Amino acid sequence: MNNERLRRTMMFVPGNNPAMVKDAGIFGADSIMFDLEDAVSLAEKDSARYLVYEALQTVDYGSSELVVRINGLDTPFYKNDIKAMVKAGIDVIRLPKVETAAMMHELESLITDAEKEFGRPVGTTHMMAAIESALGVVNAVEIANASDRMIGIALSAEDYTTDMKTHRYPDGQELLYARNVILHAARAAGIAAFDTVFTNLNDEEGFYRETQLIHQLGFDGKSLINPRQIEMVNKVYAPTEKEINNAQNVIAAIEEAKQKGSGVISMNGQMVDRPVVLRAQRVMKLANANHLVDSEGNYIEK
């Protein structure tokens, strides 16, 4: 089974809200992203950083991947953000407003210095980039390949649409080019692609429609601003009974080939190639995450 981490949901948590920081792990997001940037006023930057640092030391967030969105490289806060989060053992640092690979190189250099300073193995802090402008989209391939630490790139639509002199529309046409560029850059680099937040919490139909679109395009997941969106995303990403049964047949064919000592995998007389195997493994991982199969991998009737 391939060991790629599921990242269907990346939930924003305001770094200045003690209750939300403390309780973020109970909602079951694949990734929890503590926000030290837009959600935090200038007067609260230091206290929010300390709050998140302390929480990372004391709160059990279960199996969720822990991400922090630090302040941008054009602010006086980012260096202290990086030091505190590396010291706290954060999994991933997300840099906002990334427009060039050089910005990720600067982030990596500061992370490396912090890892050495605090005795953390060099290379264990991962990075991701938020692309929020036309220049960032144009440079997406270079950004995605900026470092071996990169786990993903994300579209941030509010700043992007402002930069493009437009705004968000219900059909999402204004984001179609950026979504496809970011997705292709991520896939070419072998990392994850994350879609932007959907800000209208009262429009569940619109949220479902947008989530179905980004799932169809191939995004790994979506950034979220409300815990109730988690279940909705998981529902869209859940495989069907037919997909699960087909994946089970592929997995069984793999096991049969192993037992025979054969390097060729076949199913119903047809050769099974690597993309089919990878797709089957991902389907089973999603099926398990959604509790759609039993311990043997068989579909559970609902």
Swiss-Prot record:
One of its GO terms (biological process) is acetyl-CoA metabolic process. One of its GO terms (cellular component) is ATP-independent citrate lyase complex. The keyword DNA-binding does not apply. Binds 1 Mg(2+) ion per subunit. It is found in: Cytoplasm. Its EC number is 4.1.3.6, 4.1.3.34. Its cofactor is Mg(2+). It catalyses: citrate = oxaloacetate + acetate; (3S)-citryl-CoA = oxaloacetate + acetyl-CoA. Keywords: Cytoplasm, Lyase, Magnesium, Metal-binding. Substrate binds at residues 69, 132. GO terms for molecular function: citrate (pro-3S)-lyase activity; citryl-CoA lyase activity; magnesium ion binding. Mg(2+) binds at residues 132, 159. It is an enzyme of class 4 (lyase). Belongs to the HpcH/HpaI aldolase family. Citrate lyase beta subunit subfamily. Represents a citryl-ACP lyase. NCBIfam families: citE. This is Citrate lyase subunit beta. It comes from Leuconostoc mesenteroides subsp. cremoris. The gene is citE.
